[in-house]
């Protein structure tokens, strides 16, 4: 089982997200969150179909409280698109695949 999504932590955040030469779609989630579980397969499809044009990263807010606080995550799932080290788009709650894809396209 190969993860198309990257596990993002405080340790690799700068390298994988801020210094990325490609846009990064970040998913702030928790294992106990119902909508996050619904969103997971959608994000997995998006990651597999990205063909390397962008990256998809997942941040477990229970394990990465520092990052959750840094980005003021009050409600999950929260999706943030980063480009050139800056957050350029954000959405909270479950979103259909088409909306997420459009969000990422807008950052390319």
Over which residues does each language-model region extend?
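Short, Lys/Arg-enriched N-terminal segments with co-localized hydrophobic residues
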Residues: 1-2
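A short beta-strand-turn-helix
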Residues: 6-24
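Residue-level signature of catalytic and energy-coupling elements of molecular machines
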Residues: 13, 26, 43, 60, ...
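Short pre-active-site segment immediately N-terminal to redox-active cysteine/selenocysteine motifs
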Residues: 21-22, 29-32, 75
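Conserved helix-turn-beta segment immediately C-terminal to the redox Cys motif
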Residues: 21-23, 40-59
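Conserved redox-active cysteine motifs that mediate thiol-disulfide chemistry
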Residues: 28-42
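Structural microenvironment flanking redox-active thiols in thiol-disulfide oxidoreductases
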Residues: 61-68
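Non-catalytic, surface beta->alpha helical segment in thiol-disulfide oxidoreductase systems
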Residues: 75-108
